[in-house]
Amino acid sequence: REAAGPPPGPPPPGYPTHLQSSGFSVGDAISWSWNRFTQNAVTLVVPVLAYAVALAAVIGATAGLVVALSDRATTAYTNTSGVSSESVDITMTPAAGIVMFLGYIALFALVLYMHAGILTGCLDIADGKPVTIATFFRPRNLGLVLVTGLLIVAVTFIGGLLCVIPGLIFGFVAQFAVAFAVDRSTSPIDSVKASIETVGSNIGGSVLSWLAQLTAVLVGELLCFVGMLIGIPVAALIHVYTYRKLSGGQVVEAVRPAPPVGWPPGPQLA
């Protein structure tokens, strides 16, 4: 009789087993995310502020160059009352069109870099690893993230041409694709497939999580720019918590206050 060998080990990262019941609760996701945010507030807020400044710089520079390179024609008008006015017509030149195209590419790349960087930091927080501000500027698997993002945008655009709804549906079910690429180093196609399977395993939880993330961002918008510095990190943490729980992963639970040190007091004698 042959001796039984050791049991097979778990699949390597990027090849999750069949998704089982996650026990996901959107209330737990919000509570965990807020707890983690309060413990890492400065570390989370500073990168979001820096990325916002970078995005504004790219948008402003692109708009300024497009206007500067475009042809402008000024027409003066005088009405019957003798009041003069002017109108300026701006015609985009080929050079301005090229600058606008390059600006869109730069903006898209920066958004994906920001998304991957914030996810990298939030995933480290979920693993209980120490994070610094620099962690959020060192995204993992950036090449996979860029290709995955291009794939999602392309399919969503094609779906949008088909009465809009197919594109919206694909965008929703592919919401965890970038997280898979960052966390498990899966290929772009495998990342999208894994996201579709993850969302399909718990559509209700995915919808509630998405609504919670949207609410966090909208509340941040209502509180002006300062609120967005809180809303975006909280939404990212909710996203990571949901991704981990629904895909069969784990997160380090929120730290609870330690019990008082020492023996409890005994009964008092009269």
Language-model features and meaning:
Residues 61-66, 73, 174, 206, ...:
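Short alpha-helix boundary/capping motifs
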Residues 9-17, 93-129, 153-190, 217, ...:
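Selective recognition of hydrophobic, aromatic-rich stretches within alpha-helical transmembrane segments
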Residues 11-124, 149:
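Short, small/hydrophobic-residue-rich motifs at membrane-helix boundaries and re-entrant hairpins
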Residues 27-54, 130-159, 173-221:
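Interfacial aromatic "cap" segments that immediately flank transmembrane helices
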Residues 1-22, 252-270:
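Intrinsically disordered, low-complexity Pro/Gly-rich regions
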Residues 2-3, 84-90, 101-104, 143-144, ...:
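Short, functional N-terminal and low-complexity linear motifs
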Residues 47, 54-58, 66, 70, ...:
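Short, surface-exposed, charged/polar-biased interaction segments
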Residues 78-94, 180-208, 237-264:
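Alpha-helical transmembrane segments and their immediate juxtamembrane interface regions
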